């Protein structure tokens, strides 16, 4: 394509900034239109990025009028499915939806159907797949640098769907998208806690078995210092990764930790510091989306991978609900945590609904941002 792809954004809160950053930094897009319930959110977006865009408080009007090539869905979780389905009906070339893919597996499956029947490419914004540290670790594992992976250990927080869907996606990416065979997990929920209007647990533990023999263990809200990254234990060595660096220990390193801090395609790590994770990941994600539109590659964040990351999260809830090991795929298409609470199986001991992301809303809104 000789020109730039026209992008429309649905939902102009904090996560949309990562999408806009990515589109602008890779240089292959123009931001044409914004849709949000709050005019000030769109005005702030224009001001922050020096944009001149058309504004809509009705996203369907934007979809009908703007002849968009790409749509970003950046609402809260409950809006991901309805707005992806709505956008697909207007047949853009691609949709980039924030993670987690949806609030239920059934809704995620409807997103897949809507995009498939309309010929629309759908990607889920697990942008850490585009971080050079993660890709370096993936390549070291596939090259046998630590032998057979035996355990991946990671720590999460702020609820499984939001934070830890990045973890389950990371496990699969590090293992070259190996398939998860079964999941065993449990949760504690003594408060009526939500995250972006999605019901979450107070803490959780999940164990994931992969077909290739590796296992992963996730501790969520069980340790004070959670982070994006992992410790990876193999038969012949170890990796300790964060979003910026990879530490390798094996026979070739003389039993000492070897530190690597790889730069990205778009940015150098030392130039951006903590912004590197967001700016490099976002630009890489957007750049590969353009390549996917042009049929040069299959996007590594394609919706099938996003769906499988969500399945693994819901498998933890389903394991807690059924008190059993859950063999994949998960067959319950509603949220198992919702089932537990609404059936009385898991009643909060300390009633009173609260949302840990309510501070992100504008005006009088306290509980929802999905219309």
PLM regions with names:
Residues 231-304, 326, 335-371:
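C-terminal glycine/acidic-rich active-site capping loop/insertion
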Residues 31, 52, 68-71, 146-149, ...:
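Local beta-strand N-terminus motif with an aromatic residue
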Residues 78, 96, 101-167:
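A contiguous active-site-proximal alpha/beta segment in oxidoreductase catalytic domains
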Residues 150-227, 231, 304:
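Rossmann-like dinucleotide-binding domain that binds NAD(P)(H)
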Residues 1-50, 368-370:
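N-terminal Rossmann-like dinucleotide-binding module
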Residues 13, 19, 40-41, 51-115:
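Beta-loop-alpha module in the N-terminal Rossmann-like domain of NAD(P)-dependent dehydrogenases
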Residues 91-92, 119, 213, 296, ...:
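Glycine-centered short loops/turns at secondary-structure junctions
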């Amino acid at each position: 394509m000789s020109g730039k792809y026209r992008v429309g954004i649905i939902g102009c809160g904090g996560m949309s900034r990562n999408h806009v950053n990515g589109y602008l930094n890779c240089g292959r897009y123009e931001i044409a239109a914004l849709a949000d319930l709050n005019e000030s959110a769109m005005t702030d977006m224009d001001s922050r990025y020096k944009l001149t865009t058309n504004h809509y408080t009705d996203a369907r009007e934007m979809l009908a009028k703007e002849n968009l090539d790409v749509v970003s869905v950046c609402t809260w979780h409950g809006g991901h499915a309805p707005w992806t389905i709505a956008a697909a009906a207007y047949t853009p070339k691609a949709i980039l939806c924030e993670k987690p893919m949806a609030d239920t597996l059934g809704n995620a499956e409807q997103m897949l159907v809507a995009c498939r029947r309309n010929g629309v490419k759908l990607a889920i914004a697990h942008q850490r797949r585009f971080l050079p540290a993660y890709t370096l670790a993936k390549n070291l594992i596939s090259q046998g640098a630590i032998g057979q992976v035996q355990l991946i250990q990671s720590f999460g927080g702020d609820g499984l769907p939001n934070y830890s869907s990045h973890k389950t996606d990371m496990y699969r990416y590090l293992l070259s998208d190996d398939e998860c065979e079964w999941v065993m997990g449990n949760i504690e929920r003594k408060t009526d806690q939500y995250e972006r209007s999605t019901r979450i647990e107070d803490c959780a533990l999940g164990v994931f078995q992969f077909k290739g023999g590796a296992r992963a263990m996730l501790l969520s809200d069980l340790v004070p210092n959670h982070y994006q990254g992992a410790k990876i234990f193999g038969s012949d060595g170890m990796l300790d990764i964060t979003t910026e660096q990879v530490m390798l220990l094996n026979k070739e390193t003389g039993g000492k930790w070897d530190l690597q801090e790889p730069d990205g395609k778009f940015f150098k790590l030392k130039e951006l510091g903590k912004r590197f994770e967001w700016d490099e990941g976002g630009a890489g994600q957007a750049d590969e989306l353009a390549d996917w539109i042009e049929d040069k590659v299959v996007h590594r964040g394609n919706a099938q991978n996003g769906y499988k990351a969500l399945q693994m999260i819901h498998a933890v809830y389903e394991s807690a609900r059924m008190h059993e090991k859950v063999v994949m795929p998960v067959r319950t298409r509603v949220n198992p945590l919702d089932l537990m609470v609404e059936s009385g199986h898991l009643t909060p001991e300390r009633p009173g609904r609260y949302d840990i992301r309510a501070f992100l809303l504008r005006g009088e809104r306290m509980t929802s941002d999905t219309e």
